[in-house]
Amino acid sequence: MASKIETLKANLEAALGARVVSLTEAIGELTLVVKASDYLEVAKMLRDDPKLRFEQLLDLCGVDYQTFGDGAYDGPRFAAVSHLLSVTNNWRLRLRAFAPDDDLPIVASLVDIWTSANWYEREAFDLYGIVFEGHPDLRRILTDYGFIGHPFRKDFPVSGYVEMRYDPEEKRVVYQPVTIEPREITPRVIREDRYGGLKH
């Protein structure tokens, strides 16, 4: 008897055919990668196909692969990643679509298929600059409306470009260029043999 993941994998391959760019398993969950041009059609099939029935979109986020794998990665920079749930079949799926243009990343909006994608797509637009084509209200959701740039992109400086301060003369909050010096953030290395001052 086939396992639940094997059954889901077979159902996905049968339903989607050549639209599957890759289908991999890791940590007990399947990841389906599709082209941006097939993203919307595949999402509809995932929801409507009686052997799949992914009724819920649980999460959607953007990913910037610019420095992925210590720079060894050589593919599209931005992806939209969704996590789907089939309540009917009790299985989950990760759906990934890479935006073909790194300078202006665009993928289709999933709001018409799963309304829960609305604010998730706004967040990915705000933080990564991924444009979700067909979104009914694609505007910033976490940063200021006048914010310049997208703060979760790998090339965005940790200190940002501007800072806010209250100006007592103008009696309002004003923006000014950052006054702190950019610095390299070095990860802390924990030496296990001397951790907490203990010698092993």
UniProtKB/Swiss-Prot annotation:
Catalytic activity: a quinone + NADH + 5 H(+)(in) = a quinol + NAD(+) + 4 H(+)(out)
E.C. number: 7.1.1.-
Membrane topology category: Peripheral membrane protein
A Gene Ontology molecular function term of the record: NADH dehydrogenase (ubiquinone) activity
Superkingdom, taxonomy of origin: Bacteria
Assembly notes: NDH-1 is composed of 14 different subunits. Subunits NuoB, C, D, E, F, and G constitute the peripheral sector of the complex.
Described function: NDH-1 shuttles electrons from NADH, via FMN and iron-sulfur (Fe-S) centers, to quinones in the respiratory chain. The immediate electron acceptor for the enzyme in this species is believed to be ubiquinone. Couples the redox reaction to proton translocation (for every two electrons transferred, four hydrogen ions are translocated across the cytoplasmic membrane), and thus conserves the redox energy in a proton gradient.
Family: Belongs to the complex I 30 kDa subunit family.
Localization per record: Cell inner membrane
Gene Ontology CC, one term: plasma membrane
Transmembrane spans: none
InterPro entries to which the protein is assigned, alphabetical: NADH_DH_suC, NADH_quin_OxRdtase_su_C/D-like, NADH_UbQ_OxRdtase_30kDa_su, NADH_UbQ_OxRdtase_CS
Pfam families per the UniProt record, alphabetical: Complex1_30kDa
SUPFAM superfamilies per record: Nqo5-like (SSF143243)
Name listed for the protein in its UniProt record: NADH-quinone oxidoreductase subunit C
Species per Swiss-Prot/TrEMBL record: Burkholderia lata (strain ATCC 17760 / DSM 23089 / LMG 22485 / NCIMB 9086 / R18194 / 383)
UniProt keyword annotations, A-Z: Cell inner membrane, Cell membrane, Membrane, NAD, Quinone, Translocase, Transport, Ubiquinone
UniProt xrefs under PANTHER family: NADH DEHYDROGENASE [UBIQUINONE] IRON-SULFUR PROTEIN 3, MITOCHONDRIAL, NADH DEHYDROGENASE UBIQUINONE IRON-SULFUR PROTEIN 3
